[in-house]
């Protein structure tokens, strides 16, 4: 039976045949990432989020734990794999993730990273910001689907009848990785796909087109060069309808219980962010629902984009904080020239 945390359960051997291993800092783990960050504590307080301190402290303990550090390492060492077809040649378009990835997603979503901004009675955005900042220090890759799920809600609310299906599952703070129609799930994640090969950030150069069906739904044909978190339950996307560039919600499963025609062509080969899947997709007559008015797609989807930008700013700040915390931990535990490194003149 596999241990929950095999690396931390092993006691390293320090007495080797040729030498003793000494003067090494202990692992940077079992540290409260919230309480040890005075700047973050002060910022939460000054922004009016003091009522969330106990919750953030508990989350900081988990984020700095040996268990979460082990999950993060395993999720990055074992990146997601794309299964386009099953052994019989039938189309799947499924992502396979290491169990550590699912553990991190369950941990973060369960703590409210993707929902707290909307469910907290006071200072929800302050709470979300602090949760995201801490989660990004623990493992930043899983923050991508959590961020998009959090950010999708303002856009979805522009179409109340669609939001009625998705909002309760976004706010439930439950992670459900199963691939099935959202009506059968207690929790849901939302992705985003805008960029195409020929246009990049110039989304008005897109060529994906949408044809309106008699029941008011749409059929999409085209491609997206960058689709983050392709295992999401639905995606906000852009396509040209008769009235112009329009925002649509494209679920992985159609209302009739069949897989939607979203083909995952390949996963991106990235320098970092290995735990998270980023992909290229094609719509082969994909079923979609319109969000907002035809011709106002950019204005509609920008509601989601604006909220993701906040978290995009948080991520590098979290990386810098984690780098600083690790450096200070190292210098506090390692000695050179009869002094701790932190007491040397260069550190003063």
Identify what each model region corresponds to.
Residues 217-261:
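A short core secondary-structure module
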Residues 2-121:
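Extended, charge-enriched "interface" segments that sit outside catalytic cores
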Residues 256-258, 280-308, 325-343:
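A glycine-rich, basic-preceded beta-loop-alpha segment at the flavin cofactor/substrate interface
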């Amino acid at each position: 039976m596999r241990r929950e945390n095999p690396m931390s359960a092993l006691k390293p051997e320090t007495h080797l045949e040729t030498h003793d291993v000494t003067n090494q800092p202990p692992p940077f783990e079992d540290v409260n990432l919230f309480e040890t960050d005075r700047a973050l504590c002060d910022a939460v307080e000054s922004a009016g989020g003091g009522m969330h301190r106990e919750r953030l402290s508990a989350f900081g303990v988990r984020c700095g734990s040996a268990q979460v550090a082990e999950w993060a390492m395993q999720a990055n060492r074992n990146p997601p794999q794309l299964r386009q077809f099953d052994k019989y040649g039938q189309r799947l378009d499924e992502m396979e993730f290491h169990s550590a990835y699912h553990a991190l997603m369950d941990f973060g979503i369960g703590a409210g990273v993707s929902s707290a901004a909307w469910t907290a009675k006071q200072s929800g955005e302050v709470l979300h910001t602090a949760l995201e900042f801490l989660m990004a220090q623990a493992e930043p890759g899983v923050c991508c689907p959590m961020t998009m799920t959090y950010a999708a809600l303002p856009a979805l609310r522009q179409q109340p009848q669609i939001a009625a299906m998705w909002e309760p599952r976004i706010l439930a703070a439950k992670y459900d990785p199963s691939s099935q129609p959202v009506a059968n799930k207690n929790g849901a994640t939302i992705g985003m796909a805008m960029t195409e090969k020929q246009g990049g950030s110039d989304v008005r150069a897109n060529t994906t087109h949408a044809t309106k069906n008699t029941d008011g739904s749409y059929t999409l044909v085209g491609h997206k060069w960058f689709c983050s978190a392709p295992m999401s339950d639905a995606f906000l996307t852009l396509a040209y309808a008769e009235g112009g560039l329009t925002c649509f919600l494209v679920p992985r499963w159609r209302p009739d219980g069949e897989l939607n025609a979203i083909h995952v062509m390949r996963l991106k080969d990235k320098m970092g962010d290995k735990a998270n899947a980023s992909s290229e997709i094609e719509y082969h007559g994909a079923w979609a629902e319109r969000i907002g008015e035809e011709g106002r797609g950019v204005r509609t989807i920008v509601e989601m984009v604006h909220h993701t930008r906040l978290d995009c700013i948080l991520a590098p700040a979290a990386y810098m904080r984690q780098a600083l915390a690790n450096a200070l931990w190292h210098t506090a535990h390692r000695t050179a020239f009869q002094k701790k490194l932190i007491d040397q003149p260069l550190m003063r």
